Curated annotation (Swiss-Prot):
Family stated for the protein in its record: Belongs to the bacterial ribosomal protein bL33 family.
SUPFAM superfamilies, A to Z: Zn-binding ribosomal proteins (SSF57829)
Pfam families the record matches: Ribosomal_L33
Record key words, sorted: Ribonucleoprotein, Ribosomal protein
One CC-aspect GO term: ribosome
InterPro entries: Ribosomal_bL33 (IPR001705), Ribosomal_bL33_sf (IPR038584), Ribosomal_zn-bd (IPR011332)
Stated name of the protein: Large ribosomal subunit protein bL33B
Protein's gene: rpmG2
Lineage: Bacteria, Bacillati, Bacillota, Bacilli, Lactobacillales
Example GO BP: translation
Molecular function per GO: structural constituent of ribosome
Length: 50
């Protein structure tokens, strides 16, 4: 089985990369999820980055 690439989820407010996920080759657009940012101290929108 091929190695799966990991991508990071970055906070849209402070830019810190708090979460990592495995890349899904079937998904064409970038993932956007509401997650808790420990640096901002609140739930913010996190976007997929490379």
């Amino acid at each position: 089985m091929a190695n799966k690439k990991k991508v990071a989820l970055a906070c849209s407010e402070c830019g810190s990369r708090n979460y990592t996920i495995t890349e899904n080759p079937n998904r064409t657009e970038r993932l956007e999820v509401q997650k808790f940012c420990k640096y901002c101290g609140k739930h913010t929108l996190h976007r997929e980055t490379k």
